[in-house]
């Protein structure tokens, strides 16, 4: 029994759709965006053991949106690899933002990389508007 309102089953070899339940409907991806954020960061950052200083620039917005955080604080030193874990395990929005800055210089530039990765993977109906998965009117 399938409980989810959305599902798609693909043939692993051919990529053809075997079954779909509202598979073409646009949905809000929420924290699933973080999977693409981490994938894009891994592809874009050459030294994941390098350290970074958590920028204070985005925290007010994350607090205002009640975003999930991993617990890294502004000004804290963190290894990029730890930010990858922080983005996925506790769904840390601050980790996603810092990875975006480290990988592309800004969230907007990073989102362009995310969208290019999606196209490269054949995800032609997928469009990202931010690195965190927080609600965006653009979907």
Regions flagged by a language model, labelled:
Residues 1-139:
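Active-site-adjacent loops and short helices of periplasmic peptidoglycan-processing enzymes
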